A protein has these predicted regions:
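Hydrophobic faces of transmembrane alpha-helices in multi-pass small-molecule transporters and flippases
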Residues: 9-37, 41, 62-66, 70, ...
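Alpha-helical transmembrane segments of multi-pass membrane transporters
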Residues: 108-112, 165-191
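Helix-terminus/linker motif at the lipid-water interface of multi-pass membrane proteins
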Residues: 4, 29-62, 80-81, 118-127, ...
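Alpha-helical transmembrane segments of multipass membrane proteins
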Residues: 27, 31, 35, 64, ...
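Short alpha-helical transmembrane segments in multi-pass integral membrane proteins
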Residues: 1-22, 78-143, 186-192
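Small-residue-mediated transmembrane helix hinge/kink sites in multi-pass secondary transporters
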Residues: 24-27, 39, 76, 155, ...
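Small-residue-rich hydrophobic transmembrane alpha-helices
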Residues: 53-116, 147-169
């Protein structure tokens, strides 16, 4: 089995992959940049806030595995059903995913809002850092419910090959809501 340079060439499906993939890759890149900006904002508040934020982000990484899995499986399931001409089944799957997302989101909300100190204590024994992480997780808890629902909707759009609206939503959430509000709140006296 040999591979020659003439065996490597572009085919007609590459533009389709780029049309779907570039918006998703750009959204992922810009979302991660927005979290780096948030990290810089929090670092300006002080060591305890910065450490608490870092710990909370570790907890959130685990929490976000669930909505991310929902989104990715929804995307594949919807794409298969749309390709088979079963749009109604794809829509029902999205609604089921949203319902499942609500159940999971409420559970995550309960833990992160009422007992954010428990998952934070898995990463450190420093009480001040745990308290700061719990404060951050309390604020995140509402987003956890929303994210579990919205990610099913995003998977539905991605499954339809509509990655541009998904990208626009992600960039809007990051740079028109999350970063500006974080900056404004960080300027308040006693920001945490």
């Amino acid at each position: 089995f040999t591979v020659k340079r003439s065996d490597i060439r572009f085919n007609c499906e590459i533009p389709i992959f780029l049309k779907l993939g570039i918006p998703l890759a750009l959204q992922e890149l810009l979302t991660n940049i927005s979290f780096l900006i948030l990290c810089a904002i929090v670092n300006g508040i002080g060591l305890e806030a910065s450490s608490g934020y870092g710990i909370a982000q570790k907890v959130i990484s685990f929490v976000m595995l669930i909505p991310s899995a929902l989104m990715q499986s929804m995307s594949a399931f919807v794409a298969q059903n749309v390709g088979a001409g079963k749009e109604e089944r794809a829509r029902k799957a999205m609604l089921t995913g949203m319902g499942l997302g609500v159940c999971v989101g409420v559970l995550i909300f309960g833990v992160t809002f009422f007992r954010g100190d428990l998952p934070a204590s898995l990463f450190t024994a420093n009480e001040a850092y745990i308290m700061r992480a719990a404060e951050y997780l309390k604020g995140f808890s509402f987003e956890a419910v929303l994210t579990c629902i919205v990610f099913s909707y995003i998977g539905y759009f991605n499954g339809h090959g509509m990655s541009l609206p998904v990208m626009l939503q992600g960039i809007t959430a990051s740079f028109l809501v999350r970063v500006p509000l974080s900056y404004v709140f960080s300027l308040k006296e006693g920001a945490s």
